[in-house]
Amino acid sequence: MNLQRFDDSTLIRIFALHELHRLKEHGLTRGALLDYHSRYKLVFLAHSQPEYRKLGPFVADIHQWQNLDDYYNQYRQRVVVLLSHPANPRDHTNVLMHVQGYFRPHIDSTERQQLAALIDSYRRGEQPLLAPLMRIKHYMALYPDAWLSGQRYFELWPRVINLRHSGVL
């Protein structure tokens, strides 16, 4: 398979759908689907804010579905549609600014301004996505947050970017 023809968003979609498929292989439960959705919230937000907002109420209604396989099929289709929208700098910036808020109680105003400037520099195309991601991951190590640490966004995007820059892709 020639992976060079895949863009970063396509690779993210492959990783995300593979993980979703493995849920079904290992015995599908409502809890597993809700955990998956929670882990992928920032990935989804980076791909399509409108589709992300549509998916939320559907997920909230999971307990109203008697047939979990039917729910899974509908959920998977909605995830496919959502992830078919390539992530873009505007939506990444939205995610990064949202995450910045988690550190507000922990970092001083100078650090907040520096992170905001780095995110804005990424938005303007002056820095790669990896620059604000690495700063945020640094803050995540200093000020752990269970929800942020569980977000696949902070694992998948650096993995794809590193593969691309290492010459593997």
UniProtKB/Swiss-Prot annotation:
It comes from the Bacteria. InterPro entries: DUF1722. It holds the Pfam family DUF1722. This is Uncharacterized protein YbgA. The gene is ybgA.
